[in-house]
A protein has these predicted regions:
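Extracytoplasmic gate region of multi-pass secondary transporters
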Residues: 14-15, 194-239, 243
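Helix-to-loop junctions at the C-terminal end of transmembrane segments
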Residues: 46-58, 246-258
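Cytoplasmic membrane-interface "Motif A"-like loop-to-helix N-cap segments
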Residues: 56-67, 255-268
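C-terminal ends and interior cores of transmembrane alpha-helices
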Residues: 68-82, 269-282
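Cytoplasmic helix-loop-helix junction between adjacent transmembrane helices
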Residues: 91-130
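Helix-loop-helix hairpin linking two adjacent transmembrane segments in secondary transporters
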Residues: 126-172
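C-terminal transmembrane helical hairpin of 12-TM major facilitator-type secondary transporters
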Residues: 259-306
Length: 378
């Protein structure tokens, strides 16, 4: 869990540097979005490969190697910031590529250690690492960036990743797995459209999540007149509440015996909260702040459900690769959302931009294959 928290504090913590980055480098919102997107671009390019490595070599080795590489690349940005923007973007992308090891491997580990009736809760707890990582970044990075500069503030997630790498080597053990001959006889689960639909729905649900997380701090500072530290603390508190919501949705799915029914209902909630934010920005600023708080909770609650469903549908032999594909789709969406939505908001304003973003979770409602959900094979 510490490994995932540290990786998330880096990959998803860069948005908290946006106000300082824009002041230091004179960037537009869309240009700042490229720095936000760089770690997730690196991450999405390697997730499937890390997943295949976890299927082949085990989770412990994959996570230890990836966390070590993350520490080196992010530490290079923090402690010896290159003068070239391209070099900084490259190192951020390499850091994201290395952090992908954690995203691809630790979900598979949880599926191996927990029975089906407890996986929703276990995966929900695992998925709290993302909002907790974002909360850590929100509490620490904005204020630290104002004192040290934007990039040196990344020393914090680099240090967390270093500690996590050591703990993985010392503490973590891979779960038992079926004999390789039995795994090799299993065909691909991608012959059915069910997994593809879950992947697509999950990618659509990333859009509202990143609409709020990538632009929440910026909106409060630029549009509402909040201080940077206060805005970061607000987002951090919301992220902690979002972490609790992921556990709650996991328990919910265990009790109803379905991952996909709760996932679809949360997609409906994401549509509504985006539209409420758009309305608030247009006519009632206080309502927009409320929607930011609620949206930061609702739009992250579904994530663990999708990951659990994907791993259960894929089966033991394919779960690492399937989770890699799942993460890739989500991170394609998370890479594109800050740039595309930033450009749209820059032209139309937040109300129109977030109303357009509501189309994504609306598509997810239809894509989620609730009727095709079956008992897992492992």
């Amino acid at each position: 869990m510490l490994a995932q928290t540290g990786a998330c504090a880096f990959v998803y913590g860069v948005p908290f540097l946006v106000p300082t980055l824009r002041d230091e480098l004179g960037l537009s919102l869309a240009e700042a979005g490229t720095y936000v997107a760089a770690p997730t671009v690196g991450l999405l390019l390697t997730l499937i490969a890390w997943g295949a490595a976890a299927d082949r070599f085990g989770e412990r080795r994959v996570m230890a190697l990836g966390l070590g590489l993350t520490t080196v690349s992010v530490g290079a940005v923090a402690l010896a910031t290159p003068g070239s923007p391209a070099a900084v973007l490259g190192l951020l992308a390499v850091g994201g590529a290395a952090a992908a090891s954690v995203f691809a491997a630790n979900g598979r580990m949880i599926m191996g250690w927990f029975p089906r009736t407890e996986r929703g809760l276990a995966m929900g707890i695992r998925q709290t690492s993302q909002p907790l990582g974002v909360a850590l970044a929100g509490l620490v990075l904005p204020g630290l960036a104002q004192r040290t500069g934007a990039f040196p503030a990344l020393v914090v997630p680099a240090a967390v990743c270093l500690v996590a790498a050591v703990l993985v080597v010392v503490v973590v053990r891979d779960p038992a797995r079926p004999p390789r001959t039995a795994e090799g006889a299993v065909g691909t689960p991608y012959r059915s459209p069910v997994l593809w639909r879950v992947h697509a729905a999950s990618a659509m649900l990333v859009v509202p999540q990143f609409a709020f997380s990538a632009f929440g701090t910026e909106y409060l500072v630029r549009q509402q007149g909040w201080g940077v530290a206060g805005a970061g603390a607000f987002v951090a508190v919301v992220q902690i509440a979002g972490a609790v919501s992921r556990i709650g949705s996991g328990v919910w799915s265990d009790r109803v015996g379905s991952r996909l029914r709760p996932m679809r209902q949360l997609a409906v909630g994401a549509v509504l909260v985006l539209l409420v934010f758009a309305l608030g920005d247009a006519v009632a600023p206080w309502l927009a702040v409320v929607a930011l708080a609620v949206g930061g909770i609702v739009t992250v609650a579904d994530n663990g459900l999708a990951f659990t469903a994907v791993a259960e549908i894929a089966g033991s032999a394919w779960s690492g690769r399937a989770l890699g594909i799942q993460n890739t789709g989500q991170n394609v969406a998370s890479s594109l959302t800050p740039v595309a939505l930033g450009a749209l908001v820059g032209v139309t304003g937040y109300a129109v931009g977030f109303a357009v973003a509501a189309v994504a979770p609306l598509l997810a409602v239809g894509l989620t294959p609730v009727r095709d959900e079956q008992e897992p094979s492992w």
